[in-house]
Curated annotation (Swiss-Prot):
Residue ranges of coiled coil: none
Protein name: UDP-N-acetylenolpyruvoylglucosamine reductase
Ranges of residues in domain FAD-binding PCMH-type: 25-197
Active site residues per record: 173, 249 (proton donor), 345
BP GO terms, sorted: cell division; cell wall organization; peptidoglycan biosynthetic process; regulation of cell shape
GO CC list: cytosol
Gene3D superfamilies, alphabetized: 3.30.465.10, UDP-N-acetylenolpyruvoylglucosamine reductase, C-terminal domain (3.90.78.10), Uridine Diphospho-n-acetylenolpyruvylglucosamine Reductase, domain 2 (3.30.43.10)
Species in which this protein is naturally found: Burkholderia multivorans (strain ATCC 17616 / 249)
SUPFAM superfamilies: FAD-binding/transporter-associated domain-like, Uridine diphospho-N-Acetylenolpyruvylglucosamine reductase, MurB, C-terminal domain
Keywords linked to the UniProt accession: Cell cycle, Cell division, Cell shape, Cell wall biogenesis/degradation, Cytoplasm, FAD, Flavoprotein, NADP, Oxidoreductase, Peptidoglycan synthesis
Annotated function: Cell wall formation.
Cofactor(s) essential for the protein: FAD
Annotated catalysed reactions: UDP-N-acetyl-alpha-D-muramate + NADP(+) = UDP-N-acetyl-3-O-(1-carboxyvinyl)-alpha-D-glucosamine + NADPH + H(+)
Length: 349
């Protein structure tokens, strides 16, 4: 009788090219790479003498990373799949997805099955497993609003752990996994709580304008209407990484205190801003970058997109160092002109 396959077996790919595994399309290489299709492979890493002592990097869609050099370690390509309704109650569905699932496809799947809530996050690049790390957000919604829990493997021990929202310590484009947990865990699956009573989030004018342009009253919009509107907006504003390498929004929208904002507003009355519940004010980073004259400009093969100043692009052949140099030049000009610090969203390695 043939032996069943070993789900923990790890097939190593030496000197593996990474251009196809990051949305910037930056040409870098990993000492080793391995495709992970089952949680047991994460759990067995610490027992594999070939790679146990190497640095590890988990990659999903590669939409939140900029390689400035080759990676002298093991890149784990998270391809763990699966989507299912774990349970439901009177108020909500609890939906689990594998860490390697494509995020946009997962959002579409929830709507196809009558479970709304995530539609404002349509077309964000990357995987389900990357979504909590970054606490992705768009058009008035952040992922943690519908987050229930996740399962992650501690790579050094192979131990699986469940994290609730409090333990994930979500912040604006931030979480425990970007700080203290960075590089220590691989996210195997994420569970979302999607309410059975849908509450549309239409606070962004771009979304309501797109709905109205489609002949849809915002008051009558369905979850699918919002999904389609968000997809149309993002496609109009953001380049397709398959055609022009990019990582989506490169900088976080900075949040400043009210006193700083009042002083800034006096100097720049047209500044685009969004009041926050805690009294602080979020600024539109794209507006700041545009006002510094960077939209459409380039440094070498790295450039600022000509339609969306928040997006840096690879015009062809850009290195990670090129992208980083462009980002630093933009940060310098925004700091000089507005006294505001811009923080990159992607991790630069």
């Amino acid at each position: 009788m043939p032996m069943p396959p070993d789900e923990s077996a790890l097939s190593l790919l030496p000197d593996h090219p990474l251009a196809a595994h990051n949305t910037f399309g930056i040409d870098a290489r990993a000492r080793y790479a391995a495709r992970i299709t089952h949680p047991a492979q994460f759990e067995a890493l610490h027992r594999d003498a070939r790679v146990a002592t190497l640095p590890h990097l988990v990659l999903g869609g590669g939409s939140n990373v900029v390689f400035t050099r080759d990676f002298d370690g093991l890149v784990l390509l998270d391809e763990i799949a699966g989507r299912r309704v774990v349970r439901d109650d009177d108020d909500a569905w609890y939906v689990e997805a594998g860490g390697g699932e494509n995020w946009h496809a997962f959002v579409g799947w929830t709507l196809e099955h009558g479970m709304a809530g995530l539609e404002n996050l349509a077309l964000i690049p990357g995987t389900v497993g990357a979504a909590p790390i970054q606490n992705i957000g768009a058009y008035g919604l952040e992922m943690n609003a519908y987050f229930d829990s996740l399962v992650a493997v501690e790579l050094a021990t192979g131990r699986s752990e469940r994290f609730d929202a409090a333990r994930c310590a979500f912040g604006y484009r931030d979480s425990f996994f970007k700080r203290d947990g960075r590089g220590r865990f691989a996210i195997v699956s994420v569970t979302f709580r999607l309410p059975k009573r849908w509450t549309p989030r239409l606070g962004y004018a771009d979304v309501t304008r797109e709905l109205e342009a489609r002949g849809i009253s915002p008051d009558a919009a369905t979850p699918r209407d919002v999904f389609d509107a968000v997809v149309a907006i993002r496609r109009a504003k953001l380049p397709d990484p398959r055609e022009l390498g990019n990582a989506g929004s490169f900088f976080k929208n900075p949040v400043i205190d009210r006193a700083q904002f009042d002083a800034l507003h006096a100097r720049a009355p047209g500044i685009v801003s969004y009041p926050q519940p805690d009294g602080r004010v979020k600024l539109a980073a794209g507006w700041l970058i545009d006002r510094c004259g960077w939209k459409g400009r380039a440094l070498g093969a790295a450039a600022v997109h000509d339609r969306q100043a928040l997006v840096l692009v690879n015009r062809g052949g850009a290195t990670g160092a090129d992208v980083l140099a462009l980002a630093r030049a933009i940060q310098h000009d925004v700091r000089t002109q507005f006294g505001v610090e811009l923080e990159p969203e992607p991790v630069c390695l």
